[in-house]
Amino acid sequence: MTKIIFPKEFWWGAATSGPQTEGRFKKKHANIFDYDFEKNPERFWHEIGPDMASNFYNDFREDIKLMKKAGLNSVRTSIQWSRLIDDLEEGTVNQDAVDFYNAVIDEFIANGIRPVINLHHFDLPVDLLHKYGGWTNKHVIGLYVKFAEQCFKLFSDRVSDWFTHNEPMVVVEGGYLYQFHYPDLVDGKLAVQVAYNLQLASSLAIQKFHEINQNPNGKIGIVLNLSPNYPASQAKEDIAAAHIADLWQNQLFMDASVKGEFPKELVELLTKDKVIWESTKEELAIIKNNKVDRLGVNYYHPNRAQKPYYSPNSLAVDWLPNKYFANYQMHGARMNVDKGWEIYPRALYEIAKNIQKNYNNIPWFVSECGMGVSNEERYLNEDGQIDDDYRIQFIQEHLYWLHQAIEEGSSCFGFHLWTAIDCFSWRNSYRNRYGLISVNIHTQEKTLKKSAHFFKNLTENSGLELSEEFFDKFNKTFRF
């Protein structure tokens, strides 16, 4: 047996979000997914939308007790803009929502769970999209800052750990490039402006936080989905493609958030292509002077890039980042076949080393990492528990590489699994389950999976023992 131990104050937890768990109960405003489901239910797996989700709005006390049983010492969730704010222009609050979030935060604390709060998790109020164009319009940035300010004033007495956005690049790519989030546009120039506006919104929220924060332990950051980009080969065209993919997918928000400036090479490329965002010197100064205190990193799978399918100078298509790179599926890659994602735990080590080397070893944590599997009922044992050994193996492998990085000086301070309880996952709905806790979406019955008991033991020991069987599997290529 090989034993690996993590730091004493390590965050062992899970991540989720308001729109994926709460349900639409007593919400005055719809977010973009509420609206999308109303208008286009056929886009969602089995036409299951966010109306009920996992019923956290009604069941949060019982749900949090289950999270405690799973050993979580910290949980990241989000406050829904569309729930908390009554008047989106004025930024006034809905008292029922204030009472709800106060009760949730208090319940976490009463159960020994650290509440980690994110402000924006893909859930823009749809009225702001239809009236102003959403994140394409800088007026919406100001409304977001009003929302953020209300959150800080209402909850910072008990919440020390804040994040501005979850995966802003997904908002850019899903809504404005690749049509997997509403409004389903394909507009490269607009996508670039949305990326800039999201970053400016984050920086302004950070500025506001530091202006009004009275909590001596208060810190604020951003959660980014970071996946190393590996070239398909050592051919110079593939190496160049992977480099530009990394500039766009990772360095854009990472550099602006941590270093206070956008990557010079990317700015030059976007300027050359005549799609550069509209900015002012004053805005760029705000970004420069309001860097994150810490970083959340979501990692699920690596990215692999090859030279583009068409000439970068082609006029046959409007501007897309894909004019510089194409995705590549490596032959023989180890796959989660249910999700279609490659499993490559070593990339987490490489992310850690990149942060250590190129981003001043800023404090960070794994804010999401998880494995989505469909039809988990096939793994039910005779006692009605899902024996998700595949998830345990997945967690162990990623922790092995994360521990290696920490031993080498990485400033990682936590690991949050996606997710605590099986949750609504946008247009995939409940197709792939990620939780330590299963949910019957018809009865809302919730049950600990085998992985929940594993995770509790992990938390209690702040480490784990890895068997010879683990290393046998670890060194083989196989499919879950």
Segments predicted by a language model, with ranges:
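Active-site region of glycoside hydrolase catalytic domains
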Residues: 2-44, 88-89, 98-480
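Active-site-adjacent substrate/metal-binding segments within catalytic domains
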Residues: 22-101
